[in-house]
Amino acid sequence: MLKNALAALVLGSALIGGQAMAADYAIDKQGQHAFVNFKISHLGYSWLYGTFKDFDGKFSFDAANPEASKVSVTLNTASVDTNHAERDKHIRSADFLNVSKHGTATFESTSVKSTGEGTADITGDLTLNGVTKPVVIAAKFIGEGKDPWGGYRAGFEGTTTLKLKDFDITKDLGPASETVELILSIEGIRQ
């Protein structure tokens, strides 16, 4: 779910970034330059952080016509990692992500709207735990340019907040833990 959101963020940021023509990008997961992280309140006293280690995605954008941009991301929900094996096992269970039944989460953008210089709202359909809901990712363009290996890259960050019960995740964690914030950091390689 985080990965999908991240891909959407990258797309929206790129749209307002600085390219003069339409371009297709692949999210750089091989070089470990893309992350789908999350945080959720732990009992209202602190934050629990985690990440999804296996995801893939692509985006296309045209700075001259951001509304035509698209983003698509697929995330392996079993790749969740909170740095605690027993907790990760519980998150993968039917109490939360139910990975045996819903092994992937996806994000498909439906619209991109510029919100200012270098920022955009990326709206799309997030499918998580077998439930599809619209989400909006607040995206920010970080930068773009040539890399040392002859390629061209663009980077973005984004955030969105999800209500767990919207995705049929109903395990009672207390009132301080009803939402999860997705924190996306994406770098794409122009194809």
Curated annotation (Swiss-Prot):
The keyword Signal applies. The keyword Signal applies. Residues 1-22 form the signal peptide. This is UPF0312 protein Pmen_0419. Its main location: periplasm. SUPFAM superfamilies: YceI-like. It comes from Ectopseudomonas mendocina (strain ymp). Coiled coil: none annotated. Belongs to the UPF0312 family. Type 1 subfamily. Pfam families: YceI (PF04264). One of its GO terms (cellular component) is periplasmic space. It is found in: Periplasm. Keywords: Periplasm, Signal.
